[in-house]
Regions:
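Conserved ATP/PPi-binding loop(s) of AMP-dependent carboxylate-activating enzymes
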Residues: 116, 130-137, 148-182, 214-216
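Gly/Ser/Thr-rich phosphate-binding loop
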Residues: 15-18, 38-46, 55-126, 139, ...
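Active-site glycine-centered loops adjacent to acidic/histidine catalytic or metal-binding residues
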Residues: 75, 99, 132, 189, ...
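AMP-binding/adenylate-forming catalytic core of the ANL superfamily
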Residues: 37, 44, 164, 170, ...
């Protein structure tokens, strides 16, 4: 319960009248699958590495889920290949989410709008692969290196800044001094925002690679590697 998500699902689950199941230290694929089946889990949330182990176990043993129908994936970008497997192979709805400890913790949540329901599957999937809309109470914007705000066109990418009533203004004992930039908290992420307000993380500011005069996102490289059948992790 030390993690920031202790402020999220442990409150929202009982408020909705649902039962909560904790996996404890057993986070390997086999243990998780047996827990899901024994406790008839319908919804779960976790980081991609957790789902990687669970999916590998299910695929290698030709297993299906009897009750598991929805998952929220955050903490890192969900690889497209993983999302495809969850949706197409196991009929599990995937909700992409993003947040930070400093945001208490949720910032955005993904999902399709009504106008997207008639789009081809591959176009819908591209939307679901984004981190989603800002939740109620959270404002966001992207800026260039000079602090100039960039357009929401799905093409321009820049430093992601957020603000809201529960987003921190400073760290404990003011370590690091004033962290806000004109009232906005710098997340350290590089992102794009499209015309419909869908945000997509392209990288961490410190992780972007410059090659041949072009900036390359490490997330793109990771997704390409994860999509290869010979790559486990």
């Amino acid at each position: 319960m030390f993690h920031v998500n202790a402020w999220g699902l442990p409150y929202s689950v009982p408020l909705s009248g649902a039962r909560m199941v904790f996996p404890g230290a057993a986070l390997d694929g086999k243990s998780l699958y047996e827990l899901f089946e024994a406790e008839k889990v319908t919804f779960s949330a976790g980081v991609p590495t957790v789902w990687l182990g669970l999916l590998n176990h299910a695929l290698q043993n030709n297993l299906t889920f009897s009750t598991f129908r929805r998952t929220v994936i955050g903490g890192a970008a969900c690889p497209p290949a993983m999302m495809d497997t969850l949706i197409d192979k196991f009929d599990v709805e995937v909700i992409h989410a993003w947040g930070m400890t400093e945001m208490s913790p949720l910032g955005t949540a993904g999902g399709l709008q009504t106008k997207h329901l008639d789009l081809p599957k591959d176009e819908q999937r591209k939307i679901l692969q984004k981190q989603g809309h800002a939740i109620y109470g959270v404002d966001m914007k992207i800026v260039d290196d000079d602090g100039k705000e960039l357009p929401w066109d799905g093409v321009a990418y820049g430093h992601l800044l957020v603000k809201g009533p529960w987003i921190i203004a400073s760290y404990y004992k003011n370590e690091g001094g004033d962290v806000l930039q004109d009232g906005w908290f710098p997340t350290g992420d590089v992102a794009t925002i499209d015309a419909d307000g869908y945000m997509q993380i392209t990288d961490r500011s410190k992780d972007v690679i410059k090659s041949g005069g072009e900036w390359i996102g490490t997330i793109d490289l990771e997704n390409l590697a994860m999509a290869h059948p010979a790559v486990l992790q």
